[in-house]
Design a protein with these regions (language model features):
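Structural microenvironment flanking redox-active thiols in thiol-disulfide oxidoreductases
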Residues: 94-131, 140-146
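Hydrophobic beta-strand anchors of alpha/beta hydrolase catalytic cores
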Residues: 82-83, 112, 156
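Short pre-active-site segment immediately N-terminal to redox-active cysteine/selenocysteine motifs
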Residues: 79-81, 85-89, 152
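Thiol/disulfide oxidoreductase modules built on the thioredoxin-like
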Residues: 128-133, 139-187
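A short beta-strand-turn-helix
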Residues: 60-81
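Active-site acidic short loop of glycosyltransferases
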Residues: 77-79, 109, 133, 150
Length: 189
């Protein structure tokens, strides 16, 4: 009789802990599904969402390049222009900038301009050398933040051949080359 009671007690405790484990396991499954869903959205869906043509004209911003000459956003007309806003202290920028630079070298028909925001020339120059960045423009006063609605780094703004902002991608995207390919093929016509 005593053994039967102990067996029932053990069975009840085991059942309770199994339910807790399954509930906790289900919670982790749900969390994993949400993370995977966000990653799919960030990498494959969001970069394919473009604003309607002619909605937002690009601001007539002018920045100095690292080597002294002026860069005018309006000079990008006739080509798809990617403005890559970053800061040297931004860890995700350090991961994404080399991907963007590699894509830029492979696609000379597009214009890619990395823009260092909020930092002086010497800091920007050191960072550009370290990461082998080309055509770097400077925005030491941070005017890009209100002009292009840059809220965080990295941020890439895509401007079509007619000078209209068609997309803005914020945050690290490991598949940024895929997003840039899609934008170039959509807007170079």
């Amino acid at each position: 009789m005593e053994a039967a009671k102990e067996s029932q007690l053990f069975s009840a405790r085991s059942s309770i802990s199994t339910r807790r484990l399954l509930t906790g396991g289900r919670l982790w499954d749900l969390l994993a599904a949400l993370v995977i869903g966000f990653a799919v959205w960030k990498i494959f869906i969001a970069p394919r969402s473009f604003e309607a043509a002619g909605t937002h004209p690009a601001p007539a911003a002018i920045y100095q390049r690292l080597h002294g000459e002026a860069f005018r956003v309006a000079d990008g007309r006739g080509r798809v222009l990617f403005l890559d806003f970053y800061a040297s202290w931004c860890e995700p920028c350090k991961l994404e900038l080399p991907l963007v630079e590699a894509w830029s070298r492979a696609h000379p028909d597009a214009a890619v301009v990395p823009i260092d925001v909020g930092e002086g020339r010497s800091v920007a120059a050191t960072f550009a050398r370290r990461y082998k960045l080309q055509n770097v423009a400077l925005d030491p006063n941070g005017s890009a933040r209100p002009l292009f609605a840059v809220e965080g780094f990295p941020t890439i703004v895509v401007i079509d051949r007619n000078g209209f902002i068609r997309a803005k991608w914020e945050g690290l995207n490991p598949a940024i080359a895929l997003a840039m390919d899609n934008a170039l093929s959509s807007f170079e016509r």
